[in-house]
């Protein structure tokens, strides 16, 4: 998944960018995931608010905005900044950890370890490449490219290549590009592809060849340029659109391809399409209706709360129907 969220270009972009920066601090430095989720939810709700927010009290009327966040909004609106963020930015350790986690392959724990060793910048990482694993070296190599958002127009071209090459390998494959792209986003952080084949179910033996032959085909046409990791059901790598004539080169982009059993495919598509907030709301509604949903299955809950056998699913709509929830197109799944 992509490391960076798109900067908010909305009526309340300053507020949402502030909340996103706080969220990243809580995740990468404090490792307080509940606070990270709270800031993310508030930022998401405010981003969709159709009016310019004039006070914390106005923001507090929105779901997910509590007293503490409302107070921060008041401070930001009054001064144009936030003391807590100013402090974080001035703290060398916090800002260095936050920065290093932007390198693909470097999580909060690795970032903290590097900072403890005095490695705080890209230049420091380059001087200490022997301390980096394979994924981190690729992340460093393409740092500038991975920082750039992928415009929707490029994502559509990338999707065409992937879907066409997949069908060349075997016309029975089903592939879906998920993430914010499927929800209609104007830009994406990376490309997330789900793949299945009728011959592969949760009852089958493992079939890594189904994933690997697709990866090899995409390498053959020079779309996939680097491999970060290649397992039996998940490939993580780097791809690049081919240049047309003498046009400038396209940036390298992160791509993940997941092979999913056919009977679990649409639960996977639903989950990886998101958004996170939509998925949480849908899972909560499912529980109220006596079902449990995850990225693999939907199962009925018995009177004791124990989940039963997975229900058959042949489309995303089947999942909505089971829990008696009106079907929502991917573009309507922000919350």
Curated annotation (Swiss-Prot):
A single GO cellular-component term on record: nucleoplasm
Organism in which the protein naturally occurs: Homo sapiens
Keyword Metal-binding applies: yes
Catalysis: reaction(s): DNA(n) + a 2'-deoxyribonucleoside 5'-triphosphate = DNA(n+1) + diphosphate; a 5'-end 2'-deoxyribose-2'-deoxyribonucleotide-DNA = (2E,4S)-4-hydroxypenten-2-al-5-phosphate + a 5'-end 5'-phospho-2'-deoxyribonucleoside-DNA + H(+); 2'-deoxyribonucleotide-(2'-deoxyribose 5'-phosphate)-2'-deoxyribonucleotide-DNA = a 3'-end 2'-deoxyribonucleotide-(2,3-dehydro-2,3-deoxyribose 5'-phosphate)-DNA + a 5'-end 5'-phospho-2'-deoxyribonucleoside-DNA + H(+)
Cited PANTHER family: DNA POLYMERASE BETA, DNA POLYMERASE TYPE-X FAMILY MEMBER
Residues that bind Mg(2+) 1: 190, 192
Reported impact of residue 285 to D: Affects DNA-directed DNA polymerase activity; contrary to wild-type enzyme, the mutant efficiently extends mispaired termini in gapped DNA. No effect on secondary structure shown by circular dichroism
Binding site for Na(+) 2: 101, 103, 106
Residues that coordinate or bind dATP: 149, 180, 183, 189-190
Function: Repair polymerase that plays a key role in base-excision repair. During this process, the damaged base is excised by specific DNA glycosylases, the DNA backbone is nicked at the abasic site by an apurinic/apyrimidic (AP) endonuclease, and POLB removes 5'-deoxyribose-phosphate from the preincised AP site acting as a 5'-deoxyribose-phosphate lyase (5'-dRP lyase); through its DNA polymerase activity, it adds one nucleotide to the 3' end of the arising single-nucleotide gap.
Record: residues binding Mg(2+) 2: 190, 192, 256
Omega-N-methylarginine modifications at: 83, 152
Residues binding K(+) 1: 60, 62, 65
Effect caused by changing residue 35 to Q: Reduces 5'-dRP lyase activity slightly
Region DNA-binding, residue ranges: 183-192
Binding-site residues, dTTP: 149, 180, 183, 189-190
Result of changing residue 35 to A: Decreased 5'-dRP lyase activity. Decreased ssDNA binding. Loss of 5'-dRP lyase activity. Decreased ssDNA binding. No effect on structure shown by circular dichroism
UniProt xrefs under SUPFAM superfamilies: DNA polymerase beta, N-terminal domain-like (SSF47802), Nucleotidyltransferase (SSF81301), PsbU/PolX domain-like (SSF81585)
Name of protein: DNA polymerase beta
Effect annotated for changing residue 61 to R: Abolishes ubiquitination
Position of the Glycyl lysine isopeptide (Lys-Gly) (interchain with G-Cter in ubiquitin) cross-link: 41, 61, 81
